[in-house]
């Protein structure tokens, strides 16, 4: 069974009498351990598809199944529990907790979904912060960090619990060239070591070059797929 399965999935947004089809009749299978990128122009449906795969939204019609679970069958509480247990996210807006330090932001998923002792948590948090070059900034709050530094903390937070699936919306958007390559290498290392599946929404050529499968969207439809 595929890790992710979309069958004739569509997403329609309504505003009064106006309907906008963000996604139309998407059928797609993603296997475990894939390193895959959704690409396409702004408004093509990349982020909407990522939201469906990440149990952040439900399709208007059709089905999206993640790890054997039909996402439309989950209520809000069950969706949150499923995401916390199995998924990691990197958002363009970072979504860091402003009153927590970088260390505490990265530790947060472990406190929520992993019953690890404090010493194991600390080792894992510092390992991830060091991997993204942020160990020396661990004590700083988000308002004391640059955009690129916040992005690195967000990446560390997404990876810290060693999730089965990581969904990343433009994860390298605020990173310099060298750091972006380092982050991509870290993600591939996690895929190789832990079998993590990575799905990206991106315009970044560096991620497109690293991806082993590219799914191209246009006007809410898949128009082309290619493998490395």
Language model regions located:
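H-loop (His-switch) and adjacent beta-strand-loop-beta switch element
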Residues: 214-226
